[in-house]
Structure formats: structure tokens, C-alpha cells
């Protein structure tokens, strides 16, 4: 308290001795073309596949009240007393099994997406700085915003890389970006992409990914579209996620020319004991095998970059469940990652959202 009062009474003591720019300069240098920033944001990942790194990541992730919507006084003892004591040990070998030479697949592919958008915008004459951030872990949202501000960006477009909107994903990115920007004295103008589940650029890229896979490997008896699950109460409270998932699935089915009975829409990654969106992916795959379906392909349209949930949960655990129940051929169709049609589509989406801002475009 006394320190704050001291700073208030003698603020000059805490100012830089030689400010980078005189704030009272009547003729400040003109701002360069990098006045617009694009912030791509994905979920996050541990820094390395070790128990300690996973514990730090889960601690931040599962402490978010948007993710775990139960009273803090009930949840925090469970988180620190049970979850963080047990889950890292179980998850460490699973992360190690998918780790790439460059690092976590989610981070590697997200970095490539950011680089692709940066190059794509520049090729179109759009002057914008592009940074990648993770909602949990590194690179952090505050660090990315700071980097954009240091390059003169006073307009920032935040793009949560979640096609379907959910409060536990998209909204918490909005929370984090506005919270950090709100602490700045010179705040940037902000825009957010709420969702792109039905955006033609996204749908075309995702459908093209599936069609390209089939052209190389042939079509299966059944296509399973597996989306990340949510507790049912989230939908009952007004979250549009379930509707977004069904819209995406319908658009992809129509674009691929499939009948309704050739596609199954399921939900994965259930956590805890609450009832989640159904049908669940793994039991559905086992039931399909028991019904005589011997060939399935699984695609995860809610993930634009491969990660633990796709490379381990779907490609390995769900494969084992399908084969154990009598299935013969199980194939996972990779996420969009850094495939050129998706980089082009994401660049299109970003360019459209930047209209009206000083990007150098007419």
C-alpha cells in the first residue's frame, strides 16, 4: 500500500531515463505498415513429454473456470490432490508416443499454419504481422500480444483455431485476450473470429482432405466424424457447439456426396463422470464392428492440427477397440495441419476478417 502511494506521489522516479519516443513530440515518426496484427490461438500443449511439464500444463488448463464449471472450492482440492498427482504419470508415455522431432505435433503444425498465413497475406499485398499463441502453455497469449504491440500493431485480429464455437474453447480465448489487452494503457482495437464451422474455405479444405485420402487409399464402408465432446449441461445452458458440429458434418457429407447412412457423427475425449454429448466415439466404433462393418475411416473435423486426441486416442485406442470387436480395417484421416488447401483457406478467412483495417489493401 505504501509503495503504491509512493509511486503515485513521485511517478517520475519510475519512468525510463530515456524513453524510446518522446510522448509529447508534436511530430512523431509515422507508423509503418505493420499496424495490423493477426493472433492465431490454439489450445496448448506441454513443453515436453515429461511428468513435470504435463503437470504444469494440466494445472493451467484445468484451473480455467471455463473448462471445469464447478465451484472452485470443490474442484481445486480434487485437481491438486488427485488429478495432478495421477494424470501426468498416465499421460507421459502417451505424449512421448506422438512427439515429433521438432516437438509437440500441435505446436509444430500450428507454427506452420502461422508461417503459411504470414506468407500468404504478404503474397496478397496484405500488410499484417502474424503471431501464434496457445491458450495454455507457450507461446502465451500475453507474450504474443506484446510481440505484436512492439511491432506497432494497434489493431489485432484474434483467430481461435476452433471451427465450432464452445465457451470452453473459443470464449476462454476471448477472455484471455481481452484480459491482457485491458491491462494496457494504450489498448489495441480488437476483433475476434467467433467460429468458422460453415465457412466455405474451411469446409472445402476439410472435404478435400478426405477426398484426397480416399483417392489414394479407397473408400471405406463407413466414415466416422468424431468431434471433441462436451458435457451435456453446456448445451443445455446455451452453448451452440452441438449444433455447430452437426452443421459441419452435414456440409461435409453433402460436399462429399455421401448418404446419411454412410456417415456416423460421434463425440470423444469424455472427462469425468458427467454425461457428455453422445454417441461416444469408441463404443460406437465397437458397435459398428459387431454389426458387421469391417472398414471405417475416422476424421476429426474439430481439430485443425493433430494432437494427443487424434494421434493417440483416435488412431490408437479407438483402432484397438474397433479391431477387438471384429473390425478389419481402421484408418485415421489426418487433420488439416499444414496442407496447402487449408493454409490457403485460413489465409482467405483472415483476409476477409481484416477488411476495413489499415492493411495496405484497397
Curated annotation (Swiss-Prot):
Q: Which pathway does this chain act in?
A: Porphyrin-containing compound metabolism; protoheme biosynthesis; protoheme from protoporphyrin-IX: step 1/1
- Pfam families referenced in this protein's UniProt entry, alphabetically: Ferrochelatase
Name the chemical reaction catalysed here.
heme b + 2 H(+) = protoporphyrin IX + Fe(2+)
Q: Name one GO biological process term.
A: heme biosynthetic process
What keywords would UniProt list here? Answer: Cytoplasm, Heme biosynthesis, Iron, Lyase, Metal-binding, Porphyrin biosynthesis
Job of this protein: Catalyzes the ferrous insertion into protoporphyrin IX.
What EC number(s) has UniProt assigned to this enzyme?
A: 4.98.1.1
Show the CDD domains listed in the entry.
Ferrochelatase_C, Ferrochelatase_N
Species, as recorded: Bordetella bronchiseptica (strain ATCC BAA-588 / NCTC 13252 / RB50) (Alcaligenes bronchisepticus)
CC per GO annotation: cytoplasm
Q: Where does Fe cation bind?
A: 228, 309
Protein family according to the UniProt entry = Belongs to the ferrochelatase family.
What's the gene?
Answer: hemH
Designated name of the protein = Ferrochelatase
GO MF annotations in UniProt: ferrochelatase activity; metal ion binding
Q: Where in the cell is it found?
A: Cytoplasm
Amino acid at each position: 500500500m505504501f509503495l503504491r502511494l509512493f509511486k503515485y506521489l513521485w511517478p517520475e522516479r519510475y519512468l525510463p531515463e530515456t524513453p524510446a519516443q518522446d510522448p509529447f513530440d508534436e511530430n512523431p515518426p509515422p507508423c509503418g505498415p505493420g499496424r495490423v496484427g493477426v493472433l492465431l490461438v490454439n489450445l496448448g500443449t506441454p513443453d515436453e513429454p515429461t511428468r513435470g511439464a504435463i503437470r504444469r500444463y494440466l494445472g493451467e488448463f484445468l484451473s480455467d473456470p471455463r473448462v471445469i464449471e464447478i465451484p472452485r472450492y470443490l474442484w481445486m482440492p480434487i485437481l491438486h490432490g488427485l488429478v495432478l498427482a495421477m494424470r501426468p504419470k498416465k499421460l507421459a508415455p502417451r505424449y512421448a508416443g506422438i512427439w515429433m522431432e521438432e516437438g509437440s505435433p500441435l505446436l509444430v503444425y500450428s507454427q506452420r499454419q502461422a508461417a503459411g498465413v504470414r506468407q500468404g497475406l504478404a503474397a496478397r499485398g496484405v500488410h499484417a504481422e502474424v503471431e501464434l499463441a496457445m491458450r495454455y502453455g507457450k507461446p502465451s497469449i500475453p507474450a504474443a500480444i506484446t510481440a505484436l504491440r512492439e511491432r506497432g500493431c494497434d489493431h489485432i485480429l484474434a483467430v481461435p483455431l476452433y471451427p465450432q464455437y464452445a465457451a470452453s474453447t473459443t470464449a476462454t480465448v476471448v477472455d484471455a485476450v481481452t484480459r491482457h489487452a485491458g491491462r494496457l494503457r494504450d489498448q489495441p482495437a480488437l476483433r475476434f473470429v467467433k467460429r468458422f464451422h460453415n465457412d466455405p474455405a474451411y469446409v472445402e479444405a476439410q472435404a478435400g482432405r478426405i477426398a484426397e485420402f480416399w483417392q489414394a487409399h479407397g473408400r471405406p464402408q463407413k466414415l466416422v466424424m468424431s468431434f471433441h465432446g462436451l458435457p451435456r449441461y453446456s448445451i443445455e445452458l446455451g452453448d451452440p457447439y452441438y449444433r455447430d458440429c452437426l452443421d459441419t458434418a452435414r456440409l461435409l457429407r453433402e460436399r462429399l456426396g455421401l448418404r446419411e447412412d454412410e456417415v456416423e457423427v460421434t463425440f470423444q475425449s469424455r472427462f469425468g463422470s458427467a454425461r457428455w454429448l453422445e454417441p461416444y466415439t469408441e463404443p460406437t466404433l465397437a458397435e459398428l464392428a459387431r454389426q458387421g462393418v469391417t472398414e471405417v475411416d475416422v476424421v476429426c473435423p474439430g481439430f485443425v492440427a493433430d494432437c494427443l486426441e487424434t494421434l493417440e486416442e483416435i488412431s490408437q485406442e479407438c483402432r484397438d477397440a474397433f479391431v477387438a470387436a471384429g473390425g478389419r480395417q481402421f484408418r485415421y484421416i489426418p487433420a488439416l495441419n499444414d496442407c496447402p488447401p487449408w493454409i490457403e483457406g485460413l489465409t482467405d478467412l483472415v483476409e476477409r476478417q481484416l477488411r476495413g483495417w489499415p492493411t495496405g489493401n484497397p
